[in-house]
Structure formats: structure tokens, C-alpha cells
């Protein structure tokens, strides 16, 4: 993948520290970002070192492991973790309305409204995944994808993280949902989506991130 370009025209593999190029919102101050980078460097007073790993289960989507870790105070600890390739979601906005997928989430036991999204294939560039899922679930095609953020939803036990993009230059096509995928596509005002999030009706993190990014860029 080194040297290849993604849909943003940017080299792949720069997930950590991406700054929302492709026409994104203004970045924070250089001094502020340097301070945050310093805070995120490994600190021997806090780091847990993996000294053993046990395979529990390998599934189609994720892998479960138990880890033995050496703690900073010299004792050992036990962690249960889930390894996952991660995913990508895309916020598509047209005339102040954002495209959402309406579907049933059996793990939550409820209906859900979410931006189009899907799992990364091994080694896949997130922008490529975002383009694929947008086309499959909604039929929409975008001229470019602007990186917004990478969100780790359950950082305490899994490495799963979702890259969120804004789609620009939309055109309509034909949806091609995966076999066994039953969804409706709806367009809702961006600010209504945020109101629904505050009311606890929309709980999906990547969707909330996408809506906030749309407001930040005056797309709502």
C-alpha cells in the first residue's frame, strides 16, 4: 500500500494523526497538537506490557484473546480483548439533510439510524471502504472523501476503530446491499439528527461525529 493514493488523493496508511485534509475544517493550533502528541507518548509509569496471549475464539468478524500483562508496579494483570479490522463510515449531506441507513441492530435489540458504514477488509484503505459502503447501501457515488476523525468506540477491550468521512460531489446510482442486509435509506436534517442524539434516540457514535462535522462545515 505504500505510495498508493486513496480517494482523497492522499497517501494511504496515515490513519494516526490525520488532520482532515481534502478541504476539511481548520485544524487546532500547532502548539496544542504538539502538547497532545506529547501526552499520548508511551509513559513507563502507565504502560502495560503484554507477556502472554491465549487464543479464545476466531470468528468471521473478530478474534477474542486473553492477555497476561506486566503492570507498571511489577505485578501482573489479565485482560480480555477483541481484535477487529475496524471500519469506515461516510456522512453524505445534500441541502442540509444527511443520508442515513435505517436498520435493525439485533445486538442492541432495537431499530437504529446510522450513516452508511462497513467493515474494513484486511489491509484495506478506509476511504476505499467508505466509498464501497456508500455505493452498496445507498447507491450514492462521491467525487471525493474528506477524512473527519477516527473513533474507537470501546477502547477498553477492543482495537476496533471507525474512520469517519464526509462525502463531496454526490451523484445517484443503484444500491447493491449485501445478501442478508435489510435496510431503508432516509434523508434527515442534520440538526434533527443532533437533536435526536441529545434525546438518546440516535446513539451511534460515527453518526454523531458525522453530523457534528457537517455542522462545523456549515453543511446543515
Predicted regions and their residues:
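Unchanged
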Residues: 77, 88-89, 94, 119-205
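Short glycine/serine/proline-enriched coil/turn segments at secondary-structure junctions
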Residues: 59, 107, 154-157
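Short helix-capping/linker segments at secondary-structure and domain boundaries
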Residues: 214-220
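Conserved Nudix-box catalytic region and its N-terminal flanking loop in Nudix hydrolases
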Residues: 2, 21-23, 29-34, 40, ...
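Acidic, metal-coordinating catalytic segment for phosphate/diphosphate chemistry
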Residues: 48-89, 94
Amino acid at each position: 500500500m505504500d505510495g498508493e493514493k486513496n480517494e482523497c488523493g492522499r497517501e494511504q496508511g496515515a490513519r494516526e494523526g490525520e488532520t482532515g485534509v481534502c478541504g476539511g475544517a481548520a485544524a487546532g493550533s500547532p502548539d496544542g497538537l504538539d502538547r497532545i502528541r506529547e501526552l499520548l507518548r508511551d509513559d513507563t509509569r502507565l504502560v502495560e506490557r503484554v507477556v502472554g496471549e491465549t487464543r479464545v475464539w476466531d470468528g468471521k468478524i473478530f478474534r477474542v484473546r486473553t492477555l497476561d500483562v506486566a503492570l507498571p508496579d511489577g505485578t501482573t494483570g489479565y485482560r480480555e480483548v477483541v481484535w477487529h479490522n475496524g471500519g469506515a463510515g461516510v456522512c453524505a449531506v445534500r441541502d442540509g439533510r444527511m443520508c442515513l441507513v435505517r436498520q435493525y441492530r439485533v445486538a442492541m435489540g432495537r431499530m437504529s439510524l446510522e450513516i452508511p458504514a462497513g467493515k474494513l477488509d484486511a489491509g484495506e484503505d478506509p476511504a476505499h471502504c467508505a466509498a464501497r459502503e456508500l455505493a452498496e447501501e445507498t447507491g450514492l457515488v462521491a467525487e471525493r472523501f474528506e477524512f473527519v476523525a477516527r473513533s474507537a468506540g470501546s477502547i477498553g477491550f477492543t482495537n476496533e476503530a471507525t474512520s469517519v468521512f464526509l462525502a463531496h460531489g454526490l451523484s445517484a446510482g443503484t444500491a447493491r446491499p449485501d445478501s442478508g442486509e435489510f435496510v431503508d435509506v432516509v434523508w434527515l436534517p442534520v440538526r434533527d439528527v443532533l437533536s435526536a442524539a441529545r434525546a438518546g434516540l440516535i446513539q451511534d457514535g460515527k453518526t454523531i461525529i458525522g453530523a457534528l462535522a457537517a455542522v462545523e462545515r456549515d453543511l446543515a
